[in-house]
């Protein structure tokens, strides 16, 4: 299952994404983030993290650098 999901993400990144203007507000891009999250945490947790990232990728969020967390946490708390 993991290999299928990663193949689908790669298909999107190679064939669909280049035909669209860049809109991702984050680094790494949402597709790269989801790919890494699935690799690191498996299909279920990786897709949860990827979906949460895509939901945050909108004009109301400033975006910026947002790497895949070292540990699985769906919600992060600011430590400031």
UniProtKB/Swiss-Prot annotation:
InterPro entries reported for this sequence: Membr_insert_effic_factor_YidD
Topological category with respect to the lipid bilayer: Peripheral membrane protein
Keyword check for Membrane: yes
Main subcellular localisation: membrane
Record-level GO cellular component terms: plasma membrane
One Pfam family of this chain: YidD
The keyword Membrane is annotated on this UniProt entry: yes
Annotated keywords: Cell inner membrane, Cell membrane, Membrane
Superkingdom per UniProt: Bacteria
Function statement: Could be involved in insertion of integral membrane proteins into the membrane.
NCBIfam families: membrane protein insertion efficiency factor YidD (TIGR00278)
Assigned protein family: Belongs to the UPF0161 family.
Record protein name field: Putative membrane protein insertion efficiency factor
């Amino acid at each position: 299952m993991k290999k299928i999901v990663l193949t689908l993400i790669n298909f999107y990144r190679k064939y669909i994404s280049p035909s669209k203007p860049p809109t991702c507000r984050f680094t790494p891009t949402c597709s790269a983030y989801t790919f890494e999250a699935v690799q690191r945490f498996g299909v279920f947790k990786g897709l949860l993290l990827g979906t949460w990232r895509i939901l945050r990728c909108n004009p109301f969020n400033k975006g910026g650098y947002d790497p895949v967390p070292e540990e699985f946490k769906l919600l992060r708390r600011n430590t400031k």
